[in-house]
């Protein structure tokens, strides 16, 4: 079991610079979520950090390239900004568990089919067997968007889009549109219905706008991610160049592959 908690409070009178939040969402496997970018829209990204096993990873391709270059340059301990934040993470706190009676209410109201209901129940059971939360809503406290709601959803599989068996789902409460980073782009996926299940059960007022898990062609999250990742790509390119220059100075005989 692995939990990060802040060990010290800021001393009185000390001006503390606000840092991007980071939340532990899976203490068993050392999974955290934190904003992709230090500024702007707080689109979450998953990271994994287990001290005992030495397993550290970030799902951002830019960060993976950054750390790969570090390893190839003889600096295997280098971490991206997202991973460094885990040292001050908010401790794990279990979200409200999904209840099957609320899912049945969704079926009764015609919000999803019996087939989708069965898919949701089966994936929920699989997450319980693995000792992890099926749906973890991501709220950045006072910085939480009143429009976009994000979820970390269990997938039960590992792939390029869910390296830690979790995917990111977003819901635009103004437009009633959903988005999931999984591969099922042309049709609604079970991950969106699981997120809707949690909202229907815990925050039904956010579903007041007519919602359709299949509708995502104008999803705001897509535009937010495009802007954020463009900015991060520029920063990452600069960071990699600086890292390469630093490593070459320290280890002139090393060669980047």
Predicted features and spans:
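Long, low-complexity, compositionally biased intrinsically disordered regions
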Residues: 1-257
């Amino acid at each position: 079991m692995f939990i990060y908690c802040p060990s010290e409070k800021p001393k009185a009178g000390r001006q503390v610079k606000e840092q991007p939040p980071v939340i532990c969402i899976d203490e068993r496997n050392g999974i955290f979520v934190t904003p992709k970018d230090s500024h702007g829209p707080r689109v979450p990204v998953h990271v994994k950090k287990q001290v005992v096993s030495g397993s550290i990873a970030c799902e951002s391709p830019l960060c993976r390239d950054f750390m790969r270059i570090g390893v190839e340059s003889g600096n295997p301990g280098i971490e991206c900004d997202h991973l460094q934040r885990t040292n001050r993470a908010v401790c794990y706190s279990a979200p409200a568990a999904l209840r099957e009676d609320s899912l049945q209410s969704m079926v009764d109201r015609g919000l999803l089919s019996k087939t989708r209901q069965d898919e949701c129940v089966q994936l929920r059971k699989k997450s319980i067997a693995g000792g992890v939360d099926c749906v973890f809503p991501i709220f950045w406290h006072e910085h939480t968007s009143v429009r976009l709601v994000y979820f970390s959803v269990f997938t039960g599989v590992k792939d390029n889009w869910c390296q830690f068996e979790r995917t990111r789902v977003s819901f635009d409460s103004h437009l009633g549109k959903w988005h999931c980073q999984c591969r099922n782009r042309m049709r609604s996926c079970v991950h969106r219905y699981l997120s809707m299940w949690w909202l229907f059960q815990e925050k039904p007022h956010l579903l007041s706008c007519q919602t359709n898990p299949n509708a995502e062609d104008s999803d705001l999250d897509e535009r937010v991610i495009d802007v954020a990742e463009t900015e991060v790509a520029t920063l990452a390119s600069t960071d990699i160049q600086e890292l390469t220059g630093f490593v070459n100075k320290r280890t002139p005989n090393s060669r980047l592959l």
